[in-house]
Amino acid sequence: MSAWLLPAGGLPGAGFCVPARQSPSSFSRVLRWPRPGLPGLLLLLLLPSPSALSAVFKVGVLGPWACDPIFARARPDLAARLAANRLNRDFALDGGPRFEVALLPEPCLTPGSLGAVSSALSRVSGLVGPVNPAACRPAELLAQEAGVALVPWGCPGTRAAGTTAPAVTPAADALYVLLRAFRWARVALITAPQDLWVEAGRALSTALRARGLPVALVTSMETSDRSGAREALGRIRDGPRVRVVIMVMHSVLLGGEEQRYLLEAAEELALTDGSLVFLPFDTLHYALSPGPEALAAFVNSSQLRRAHDAVLTLTRRCPPGGSVQDSLRRAQEHQELPLDLNLKQVSPLFGTIYDAVFLLAGGVKRARTAVGGGWVSGASVARQVREAQVSGFCGVLGRTEEPSFVLLDTDASGEQLFATHLLDPVLGSLRSAGTPMHFPRGGPAPGPDPSCWFDPDVICNGGVEPGLVFVGFLLVIGMGLTGAFLAHYLRHRLLHMQMASGPNKIILTLEDVTFLHPPGGSSRKVVQGSRSSLATRSASDIRSVPSQPQESTNVGLYEGDWVWLKKFPGEHHMAIRPATKTAFSKLRELRHENVALYLGLFLAGTADSPATPGEGILAVVSEHCARGSLHDLLAQREIKLDWMFKSSLLLDLIKGMRYLHHRGVAHGRLKSRNCVVDGRFVLKVTDHGHGRLLEAQRVLPEPPSAEDQLWTAPELLRDPSLERRGTLAGDVFSLAIIMQEVVCRSTPYAMLELTPEEVIQRVRSPPPLCRPLVSMDQAPMECIQLMTQCWAEHPELRPSMDLTFDLFKSINKGRKTNIIDSMLRMLEQYSSNLEDLIRERTEELEQEKQKTDRLLTQMLPPSVAEALKMGTSVEPEYFEEVTLYFSDIVGFTTISAMSEPIEVVDLLNDLYTLFDAIIGAHDVYKVETIGDAYMVASGLPQRNGQRHAAEIANMSLDILSAVGSFRMRHMPEVPVRIRIGLHSGPCVAGVVGLTMPRYCLFGDTVNTASRMESTGLPYRIHVNMSTVRILRALDQGFQMECRGRTELKGKGIEDTYWLVGRLGFNKPIPKPPDLQPGASNHGISLQEIPPERRKKLEKARPGQFTGK
């Protein structure tokens, strides 16, 4: 089938003409018109000849414009239209066809892409596309059948044949030339999870393998996030060794998030150290220019800048001094593109779409010239495209002598791209551009592979003869097996000797441990209760008891010292596995003042040390601490714990966990019951590594109860496998819960009044977040903030144990916590007869302190007041946007003149008490009152997004409604009218002065808000345009009336508005008074003044009866 060019007029009355489809046999025949009859013949005689009419060639541009936002940024509509306009202008000079361009959407899923290709080929004479490689081969066959010229631009490895023209960008050829030049044969591909990129990866791997390269791995990111990137990179790291990783996804330079996550994950996994080269695939389809502009995405990410040092960018080349952005700028200057188009937001893929349309047009022109201006077929157009040479968007397209690709690399600073090599895929050449390549850390390029991979006539086996490879393989395997066997045997024998006897003995039996039973008790009863209750037993009592352990025995004597036994779950433990011995040996090597020492593994019930018949006891033996667990200590209310005591215990806990984390040990079971306190009140962490031992012994842990899980981090609650192993971030969360126990001296989450099951369910499945509540009077603010950081929902937001240690030390400002002094002080308090008096004075002091704190928080914001109490300086703070409220009393000067001073004070007190009660219901802050002026702000000191405008507007409506019914006690017949002005904008807030400090606001926003009030009217809320915009954006139904142009002193003339209500606001609003011509807007009229007060006013202000 052929694509014919018909006269644009078509048949009489037919309108625009589209390309007609003819059978193959019609090529040898003359196109026949339908018989028009006599009227038609007369009309045909009047028509000009077909050659005098322009013809139409309809081009379809197919791509995922609607489903992929980064493809849509190429503005394919503008690119295709610009190409068509220029083509029509140029072709009109030589009588060529007129081009029409149709933008056709291609779904991002493969099945939809095939349907889009089939539909497109029935509507156009030439097709640019598709993008999905899975649709490329079907598109070639369908285009061949339909006789439509096809110009692919997203199909790596496509060969020109039939009606299919060469690809606009020969991606596979260009990549092969680059890999051959550096002899990088072993490559791996990582694709984004979308169908389009998965198919592109498959097509590219097929094309590279067809050229003889050993593509080691083609993998896809399962999800478009950091975890998906890490999993894909892990498969490459654990797979066969490769030199190059090709990233088949949107480039990070165009905003591709998948490639960003991939490079950041590669940096974290140390894969960007120079051992691998990362090549982006999509940059082969458009032209990037050297310079700093391309790296704008790295401005706020030093990690991404470092990772991109391992990336080489192969991209299409523009002529020297030219770029896609320059061409876009010239087109806009010539008004070929909209003037309001933001060129920086346009993807360089714009030029590729433009070039594809121009290449197709060049083929049409050459085909028409070859047949003398006649009609042409799709095959002839495709054939001529292969030989065409046209002027592209930023350079010459087709067969040129200049390289069509350029290799870009970053310098050592990673601040801009440099051209290092020029590449010609047609000639297969690569030559230097003058700038050397820079690899990470200034190291060399990855080593080359054998050259045989790039020689089609040689079967490549890595450059070594197969026989030698086989012999070497056998030798290496034999030596490795022999060495492994000897090492295992010697290690096993040595370990067995060390564990069985000597100072490093770890396997303990009944001959080593003496167990405790109460005097006179039966053999089945043992000591119950907390660890601290065992401290009263003497060594002689212990040694007099028969050595027969029972199931609940957990305390004994070993080498004259108290020991504690932590039993393994289950029964019938007849032997200790070698893996358990190895794991315990590593745990026993942990020595720290705040980590309980592991002494050995106790085993009873074997043939050598029989216990109760049918039972086998396996337990971890550790040092025993006389004071019991931290949980027991907190439960003993007779022990008074001040902050020094608490901070000492917490600091010991943090030190112990910090040591474990430095040794790579995640506790996983940290709770207050696993923190023990010795006789010197030193806290030690115990039960660490218990999960490792259970796993090595292949013992299933007992299912934890809800109460035992109160210390567990939310991510561990959601993943039981993580909960068994434990994580470092999970230990930080558990530490925060223990801090709450110590600070509040209560069980975890006790203040929430929920059952443990309810707490676990809420912690596991937010929102809302479920965390303990700690008041500021129970601990320093820094301690509460540290707790809040440690129990953050996301593990990566929690501080490390090192940072936690530094932050906690800073709470006491470097003072050392001496727990012995604290104990002595407490003992003195117990023995002193002044205890009651001290308690009474302390309570009085606390009450006075609370009064002072309340008074201070009424004068200053709580955060500022707290900072002043802590003795720290309060730095001024900049707020990007707040809303200010100003109001005053109309005619206040007149009212003051008619009133006694005490009556004025009563008036202001009554009015401001009313205002204060109203603002308590809104998220606002009262700044100050000066005379009759009342100033309120929202959005500071606590930011609340854009709600500040709505909060002030609602408060203003409530105040205005309340003032309507307010009356002065001494002049109830005189109305109290107020003027209100609102304005939004930035300001700076800070504390001014040391004596009677004030929290003041500064900035032009304050002046403008004051001007809005002073130019307002009685019973009116005067709103500036800045506040109106925010209220309209919030869309909460605020009703405003335009006042018109208003002159603001020092600001000029601006448009202002009246706020008159809000949808759903049903409170009455007083009606503004009617203004008489010539009357003042800011005073009280003579008629409103009572006669008895008017005389006083006449004496105070002769001849003046109105005014403020």
UniProtKB/Swiss-Prot annotation:
GO molecular-function terms, A-Z: ATP binding; GTP binding; guanylate cyclase activity; protein homodimerization activity; protein kinase activity; protein-containing complex binding
Record PTM text: There are 9 conserved cysteine residues in sensory guanylate cyclases, 6 in the extracellular domain, which may be involved in intra- or interchain disulfide bonds.
Database matches in Gene3D superfamilies: 3.40.50.2300, Nucleotide cyclase (3.30.70.1230), Transferase(Phosphotransferase) domain 1 (1.10.510.10)
UniProt EC number: 4.6.1.2
Side of membrane Extracellular, spans: 55-465
Source organism, top-level taxon: Eukaryota
KW Endoplasmic reticulum (keyword) present: yes
Transmembrane segments annotated in the record for this chain: 466-490
Entry-linked InterPro entries: A/G_cyclase, A/G_cyclase_CS, ANF_lig-bd_rcpt, Cyclic_nucleotide_synthase, HNOB_dom_associated, Kinase-like_dom_sf, Nucleotide_cyclase, Peripla_BP_I
Annotated membrane topology: Single-pass type I membrane protein
Disulfide bonds: 108-136
Activity regulation summary: Activated by GUCA1A when free calcium ions concentration is low, and inhibited by GUCA1A when free calcium ions concentration is high. Negatively regulated by RD3; RD3 inhibits the basal and GUCA1A-stimulated guanylate cyclase activity.
Region spans: Disordered: 1069-1108
Quaternary context: Homodimer; requires homodimerization for guanylyl cyclase activity. Interacts (via C-terminus) with RD3 (via C-terminus); promotes the exit of GUCY2E from the endoplasmic reticulum and its trafficking to the photoreceptor outer segments. Interaction with RD3 negatively regulates GUCY2E guanylate cyclase activity.
Protein name: Retinal guanylyl cyclase 1
